[in-house]
């Protein structure tokens, strides 16, 4: 018996030794061994996951680029590239760098959506079905809805300033963006602007969005939660059911509206396209609900974050603020989005905000095609995950001088080709954000109305507000650390 036990122990030791030696061999001789990066990245991705969970991944990866150059190994099987030519190659239309495994964990077992699908044929087909509703031409038809909500938002800000002595622009921009995309997606506003508080749908959305971070960082927890009732997952499941129910009610309401008044009377862009697709048998009702819900996720916090950092950055610099105020003051009383679009300085302020404070600053992971690819003079084998993050692309000092410390709209007076190639606040290629045109319209109209109404705003110090409140927590989306942005007007 003792002999058997000793032999078993020796076998285990030998097996462990073989595994360790195999790992060491692969680390130092594998196809990624020659790539620059910290030594720890060759062995484990835990350091990267730690920074991801702490909301710090883009800053961590940017520091690695500053140390190791434009291509860096950030985990055993993942690289990050900060090079405009490589990014253009990866994200161009018809690129064979398809979305990576990261996206497969977003919906877990839910049907795939336009955003979460990794299949290019599925994505192309679904985008053809849904893209028309969010095209620039279609969004123009909804300008009155967007403009009305922007005006209501600024009116509510003015009332808060009288009552509170300052404005929390982050709160109001969140209400604006969510109410707007809610009406365009479901045909009915959440009425957060009128009530001055978050709706149940918005609170549910926050919980489900946080769960998405956990799923993509620790996908095994989703599988565990199927058998073990983890409290947070249980709460998120209840929130998901409420959101699903709201979407179902909205779609049924839309269908009844069509039956009574015809499709031409319906105002909901996403619901109109999705219901038309359902009538053709292209999408199930469950798929329509998921796509409409995806519009809410993509179209709420993103625009609000951009507007918040735009106002904060402008108010910190009196020269920029005064130039912007002077330009929007030239608009006619009943100005339109086209009028704002024609303002060069306003456009530069918006672009500089999207450069320095993109709402989605982190990785856009893609899988290298099976035959491999050469990126930044390095051959990368097929199947490796390669990411590009706009946080780094937008901070390349060779392309954007003094990129971190200087909020400079004038850098966009005559942008270089490299600046245009590196500028990707809405993604790139066939995967460019479907809501880009709506986001741009919201940014233009909200910026113009805010700085026409408030002509000398400054960053507040009331209620203990400091720049530390605006420190960015970077998950998939950015959020200010203090979840507020106080402005004196």
Curated annotation (Swiss-Prot):
* Single GO molecular function: oxidoreductase activity, acting on paired donors, with incorporation or reduction of molecular oxygen
Q: What is the lineage of its organism?
A: Eukaryota, Fungi, Dikarya, Ascomycota, Pezizomycotina
Q: Which keywords fit this entry according to its UniProt record?
A: Heme, Iron, Metal-binding, Monooxygenase, Oxidoreductase
InterPro entries according to UniProt: Cyt_P450 (IPR001128), Cyt_P450_CS (IPR017972), Cyt_P450_E_grp-I (IPR002401), Cyt_P450_sf (IPR036396), Cytochrome_P450_monoxygenase (IPR050121)
Q: Which residues form the signal peptide?
A: none
The pathway to which it is assigned is: Secondary metabolite biosynthesis
Protein name per the record = Cytochrome P450 monooxygenase tazI
One Pfam family name is p450
User: Which family, according to the similarity comment?
Assistant: Belongs to the cytochrome P450 family.
Do the record's keywords include Heme? Answer: yes
Query: What does this chain do?
Result: Cytochrome P450 monooxygenase; part of the gene cluster that mediates the biosynthesis of azaterrilone A and other azaphilones, a class of fungal metabolites characterized by a highly oxygenated pyrano-quinone bicyclic core and exhibiting a broad range of bioactivities. The first step of the pathway begins with the non-reducing polyketide synthase tazA that assembles one acetyl-CoA starter unit, five malonyl-CoA units, and catalyzes a series of Claisen condensations, methylation, PT-mediated cyclization, and finally releases the first hexaketide precursor through the R-domain.
Q: Which gene encodes it?
A: tazI
Cofactor(s) required, per the database record: heme
Judging by the UniProt lineage, the source's domain of life is: Eukaryota
- Induction note: Expression is positively regulated by the azaterrilone A cluster-specific transcription factor tazR.
Q: Which PANTHER family match?
A: CYTOCHROME P450 (PTHR24305), CYTOCHROME P450 MONOOXYGENASE STCB-RELATED (PTHR24305:SF96)
Residues bound to heme are 433
So what EC number does this one have? 1.-.-.-
């Amino acid at each position: 018996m003792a002999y058997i036990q000793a032999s078993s122990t020796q076998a285990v030791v030998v097996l462990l030794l073989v595994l360790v030696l195999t790992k060491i061999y692969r680390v130092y001789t594998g196809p990624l061994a020659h790539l620059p990066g910290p030594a720890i990245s060759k062995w484990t991705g835990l350091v990267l996951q730690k920074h991801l969970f702490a909301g710090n991944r883009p800053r961590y990866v940017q520091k690695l680029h500053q140390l190791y150059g434009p291509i860096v190994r950030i985990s055993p099987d993942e690289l990050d590239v900060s090079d405009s030519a490589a990014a253009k190659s990866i994200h161009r239309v018809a690129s064979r760098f398809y979305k990576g495994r990261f996206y497969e964990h977003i919906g877990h077992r839910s049907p795939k959506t336009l955003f979460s699908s990794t299949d290019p044929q599925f994505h192309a087909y679904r985008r053809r079905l849904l893209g028309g509703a969010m095209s620039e031409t279609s969004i123009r038809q909804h300008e009155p809805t967007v403009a009305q909500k922007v005006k209501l938002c600024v009116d509510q800000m003015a009332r808060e300033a009288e009552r509170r002595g300052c404005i929390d622009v982050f709160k109001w921009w969140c209400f604006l963006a969510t109410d707007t995309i809610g009406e365009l997606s479901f045909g009915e506003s959440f009425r957060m602007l009128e009530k001055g508080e978050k709706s149940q749908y918005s609170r549910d959305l926050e919980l489900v969005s946080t769960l998405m971070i956990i799923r993509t960082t620790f996908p095994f927890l989703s599988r565990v939660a199927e058998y073990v009732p983890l409290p947070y997952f249980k709460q998120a499941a209840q929130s998901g059911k409420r959101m699903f129910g709201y979407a179902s009610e909205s779609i049924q309401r839309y269908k009844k509206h069509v039956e009574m008044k015809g499709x031409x009377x319906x105002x909901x862009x996403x619901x109109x396209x999705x219901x038309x697709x359902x009538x053709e048998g292209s999408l199930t009702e469950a798929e329509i609900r998921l796509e409409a819900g995806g519009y809410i996720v993509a179209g709420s916090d993103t625009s609000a974050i951009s507007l918040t950092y735009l106002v904060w950055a402008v108010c910190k610099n009196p020269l920029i603020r005064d130039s912007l105020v002077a330009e929007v003051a030239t608009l006619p009383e009943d100005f339109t989005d086209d009028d704002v679009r024609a303002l060069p300085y306003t456009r530069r302020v918006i672009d500089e905000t999207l450069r320095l404070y993109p709402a989605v600053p982190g990785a856009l992971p893609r899988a290298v095609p099976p035959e491999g690819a050469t990126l930044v003079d390095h051959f990368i084998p097929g199947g490796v995950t390669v990411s590009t993050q706009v946080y780094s692309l937008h901070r390349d000092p060779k392309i954007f001088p003094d990129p971190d410390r200087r909020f400079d709209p004038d850098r966009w007076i005559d942008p270089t080709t490299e600046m245009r190639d590196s500028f990707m606040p809405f993604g790139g290629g066939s995967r460019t954000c479907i809501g880009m045109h709506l986001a741009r319209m919201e940014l233009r109209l909200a910026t113009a109305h805010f700085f026409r109404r408030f002509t000398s705003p400054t960053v507040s110090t009331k209620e203990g507000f400091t720049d530390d409140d605006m420190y960015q927590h970077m998950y998939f989306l950015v959020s200010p650390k203090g979840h507020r942005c106080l402005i004196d007007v």
